[in-house]
Amino acid sequence: MDMGKGRPRLKLPQMPEAHPQKSCAPDIIGSWSLRNREQLRKRKAEAQGRQTSQWLLGEQKKRKYQRTGKGNKRGRKRQGNVEQKAEPWSQTERERVQEVLVSAEEETEHPGNSATEALPLVPSPTKAVPADQCSEAHQESIQCQERAIQNHSQTHLSPTTCQGIAVLQHSPKMCQDMAEPEVFSPNMCQETAVPQTYPPKALEEMAAAEPLSPKMCQETTVSPNHSSKVPQDMAGPEALSPNMCQEPTVPQEHTLKMCHDVARPEVLSPKTHQEMAVPKAFPCVTPGDAAGLEGCAPKALPQSDVAEGCPLDTTPTSVTPEQTTSDPDLGMAVTEGFFSEARECTVSEGVSTKTHQEAVEPEFISHETYKEFTVPIVSSQKTIQESPEPEQYSPETCQPIPGPENYSLETCHEMSGPEDLSIKTCQDREEPKHSLPEGAQKVGGAQGQDADAQDSENAGAFSQDFTEMEEENKADQDPEAPASPQGSQETCPENGIYSSALF
């Protein structure tokens, strides 16, 4: 029974202890949720407070470091980089300023260049490029000034002229050529002296006193295709070289003016008259126009008789072209009507011996023509009266000189042949009338006369007059002249010249 009584007692105290816990549990549940929220709010506030406190402390520390100079090295480096990025613009500007200052200082040394001194000293990136150009232009201006001092005796060129030269990009050689056109090489001088530097009038005035050197004449005749005006300039001072004589005869591309000028007054040496007398190395010479230009008097005729006062050296060259045609005879027949005037013009030609030696070769004068020229024609007293000047050569000089030259009589015959005009040559000149050389045809066209008319009139009159003159002049022949053909060949060619002067 005690057991029963005691059991519920034990149970009872346990029950009421459990109920209050259960009863308190729902009340506490609500409170626990509230507590958690509050705790979260507190924790958040504390965290924010800590963050704010740390931030404030950091800010205060930064301010202290900046004031005292102690701070973050990285921050200093970044600031230095930013400053360096800004500095290159200033450095380029400084360099440009220095360039402008240097150019201004150099220009102050040259007072003529006043325009570039006004450049602004405050530089800008847009104005830097013109400064470089100004420096280059200034260098070329200095070069131009130095050239001008040497060439034009001018101390300073204006900047505009120097810039113009810089724009045109004249090299120093070009400037020298522009400034000194007279300092050429010898070859250039030989080529350009006669046809370019002197006007035709000056050459005509200089023709009497200024014979050109052989090299000069050779260079002037290299280009045969000059216009008519260029040969006038070329032919003024005529100590003609072999090339000069070959050009007007063989190519025959020169006009009448070339041929007229070739016959300008020059003094022939004794050797030249042997080839000049009858073969006429220049078939295109218009004696009428040449005599009008030159105004040569018949007094100069005796000087053309110097054929035999020369050595026999000229005979080989004059005889070499023996394979010939009758064209040179025709060319001679064309201008025989004006033979006297042609003689007057060719008396004083200052042509060297070699010129006509070479000039006779392209004419293709045959061996037969030399033989046909052998019959002597003695001029009458009328012709001698027309040339009143005393002859400088005695009859002895007219005879060929047998000296150390190793030439046979045949060479002498051929030498004296071209000067002695005969009836046979006149007859031969009458026959082939229509095969004139190009030079003679050009001459006839320029004179306004037909070549055929000249052939018919001149050759006919020439043959008739020769037949009459032979009969008259036989009495006037020198007693020393032998009757044989060789003797007639060796006689003085003055007779042929005087007889031709009548025509």
Swiss-Prot record:
Gene that encodes it: Hemgn
Biased composition regions of type Basic and acidic residues, renumbered to the chain: 426-436
Tissues and organs where the protein is expressed, per its UniProt entry: Expressed in hematopoietic precursor cells. Highly expressed in bone marrow, the red pulp of the spleen and round spermatids. Weakly expressed in peripheral blood cells.
Superkingdom is Eukaryota
Quote the InterPro entries the UniProt record gives.
Hemogen
Keyword line: Developmental protein, Differentiation, Nucleus, Phosphoprotein
Q: Does the keyword Nucleus apply?
A: yes
Give the subcellular location. Nucleus
Instruction: List the GO terms this entry assigns under cellular component, sorted alphabetically.
Output: nucleoplasm
- Region annotation (Necessary for nuclear localization) ranges: 7-87
Could you tell me the Gene Ontology terms of the biological process aspect for this record? cell differentiation
Which portions of the chain have biased composition (kind: Low complexity)? 385-396
Residue ranges with Basic residues bias:
1-10, 61-79
Q: Which residues form a coiled coil?
A: none
Q: Where in the sequence is Phosphoserine found? A: S90, S103, S124, S153, S158, S171, S213, S223, S228, S241, S269, S387, S394
- Phosphothreonine: modified positions: T286
- UniProt-annotated stretches for the region Disordered: 1-129, 381-503
Q: Per its database record, what is this protein's job?
A: Regulates the proliferation and differentiation of hematopoietic cells. Overexpression block the TPA-induced megakaryocytic differentiation in the K562 cell model. May also prevent cell apoptosis through the activation of the nuclear factor-kappa B (NF-kB).
UniProt name for this protein = Hemogen
